[in-house]
């Protein structure tokens, strides 16, 4: 036993021990040998071109840029190809126009040869007809341009959302107010936007506010139009004796609904514009798959307890009413000057609860 010390208070001393340093020395020697055998790289110079990306173009700061690029790639329109059918129609149209001109010239000459007052009467009637045709052309052109303006505003709004500066969004909202100024339902919304014009500096928030204030009342009116057309189609289909009557009435109500939807959102299409709009609506239905009446509607009807209560004619009426509602929703998507972002897009399920009780009499 040893006496306790300050380092060892219990008095227990550690025995001497030996440690080998050969392994560590061999490791250091191998590392030195490897370093000596490895040749050193000569100094080199590199030319680097540093490009600074602006904040508004940086995809890490603006994730919406990548999303918009993907959507644009998906929604890119198909490239139009050369059509021999259009060439043939144009050629025959010119030929018919020349034939009509020669026939008119010969008719007027014959009338002048018989009596001067007949010739002048024919010239007056021809002038009135030409002026009427010019007026129709101007009206159709204005309607097409107005429909194009609505689509332009929608495309520019989607592009202005990703920008940090609000100048483009403010100009877009001003154009939207000008487009909808004839509708008294947007007066309150236009006043609200005018009052908050200098308070909002964020472009997405400004466009969302414009959608809620300007298009919110119009969306409610559009829902009333869709529901009314769907109910009328359901009732007429249920009581009509012939299937041909059903088809004709569905076409009539669909065309009437599409025109009303276009006029509600600021577009006033003419005859050609209406044909183009109907074609776009049918194409939209075909792309989204909304034109198919399948198990989804059947499940909705069963969920409302109608499967055991409706007769065959009443069931057809409900299905045709749902089809009319789908056409109205597609027209709403196309005619609306802004895409659905701040407000919820209506679905077919929003109309089943209102349409089915109307058919069952509850």
From Swiss-Prot:
It is found in: Cell inner membrane. One of its GO terms (cellular component) is plasma membrane. Keywords: Cell inner membrane, Cell membrane, Membrane, Transmembrane, Transmembrane helix. Residues 1-47 are annotated as: Disordered. PANTHER family: UPF0283 MEMBRANE PROTEIN YCJF (PTHR39342:SF1). Belongs to the UPF0283 family. This is UPF0283 membrane protein Arad_2632. It comes from Rhizobium rhizogenes (strain K84 / ATCC BAA-868).
């Amino acid at each position: 036993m040893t006496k306790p010390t300050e380092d060892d208070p219990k008095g227990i001393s550690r025995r001497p021990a030996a440690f080998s340093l050969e392994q560590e020395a061999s490791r250091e020697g191998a590392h030195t040998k490897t370093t000596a055998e490895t040749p050193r790289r000569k100094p080199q110079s590199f030319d680097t071109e540093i490009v600074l990306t602006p904040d508004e173009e940086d995809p890490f700061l603006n994730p919406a840029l990548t999303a918009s690029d993907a959507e644009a790639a998906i929604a890119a329109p198909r490239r139009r190809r050369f059509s021999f059918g259009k060439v043939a129609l144009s050629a025959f149209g010119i030929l018919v126009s020349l034939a009509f001109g020669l026939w008119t010239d010969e008719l007027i000459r014959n009338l002048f040869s018989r009596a001067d007052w007949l010739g002048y009467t024919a010239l007056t009637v021809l002038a009135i007809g030409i002026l009427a045709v010019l007026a129709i052309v101007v009206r159709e052109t204005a309607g097409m341009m107005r429909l194009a303006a609505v689509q332009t505003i929608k495309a520019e709004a989607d592009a202005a959302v990703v920008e940090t500066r609000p100048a483009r969004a403010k100009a877009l909202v001003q154009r939207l107010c000008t487009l909808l100024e004839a509708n008294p339902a947007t007066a309150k919304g236009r006043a609200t936007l005018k009052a908050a014009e200098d308070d909002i500096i964020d472009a997405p928030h400004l466009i969302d506010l414009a959608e809620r204030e300007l298009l919110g009342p119009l969306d409610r009116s559009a829902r009333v139009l869709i529901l009314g057309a769907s109910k009328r189609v359901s009732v007429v289909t249920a009581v009509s004796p012939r299937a041909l009557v059903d088809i004709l009435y569905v076409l009539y109500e669909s065309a009437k609904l599409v025109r009303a939807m276009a006029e509600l959102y600021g577009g006033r299409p003419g005859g050609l514009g209406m044909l183009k709009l109907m074609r776009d609506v049918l194409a939209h239905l075909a792309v989204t798959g909304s034109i198919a009446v399948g198990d989804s509607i059947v499940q909705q009807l069963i969920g409302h307890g109608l499967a055991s209560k409706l007769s065959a004619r009443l069931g057809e009426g409900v299905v045709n009413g749902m089809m009319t509602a789908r056409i109205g929703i597609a027209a709403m998507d196309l005619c609306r000057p802004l895409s659905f972002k701040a407000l919820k897009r209506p679905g077919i399920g929003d109309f089943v609860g209102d349409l089915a009780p109307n058919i069952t009499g509850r």
